[in-house]
Amino acid sequence: MVTIRLTRGGAKKRPFYQIVVADSRSPRDGRFIERIGFFNPLAAGQAERLRLDVAKVDAWVAKGAALSERVATLVKEARKAA
């Protein structure tokens, strides 16, 4: 099954997440199909907190991809901001 989920990057105690489309059997930070955005939970000042290509999310969901719980809330937030 294909899922849209977060992969962790950044440094120790400074997380930065990529929002990716990946096979659910692959490891969290392993192989992915497509990168569709990022999420920076520690963004301060003018730094961008969330960037997400909502059109690509809709396209993948139409193909049968499932959203993780956290990504579902981020998609809702991105739609509200747009």
Swiss-Prot record:
NCBIfam families: S16. Keywords: Ribonucleoprotein, Ribosomal protein. It holds the Pfam family Ribosomal_S16. One of its GO terms (molecular function) is structural constituent of ribosome. PANTHER family: 30S RIBOSOMAL PROTEIN S16, SMALL RIBOSOMAL SUBUNIT PROTEIN BS16M. It comes from Haemophilus ducreyi (strain 35000HP / ATCC 700724). GO terms for biological process: translation. Belongs to the bacterial ribosomal protein bS16 family. One of its GO terms (cellular component) is small ribosomal subunit. SUPFAM superfamilies: Ribosomal protein S16. This is Small ribosomal subunit protein bS16.
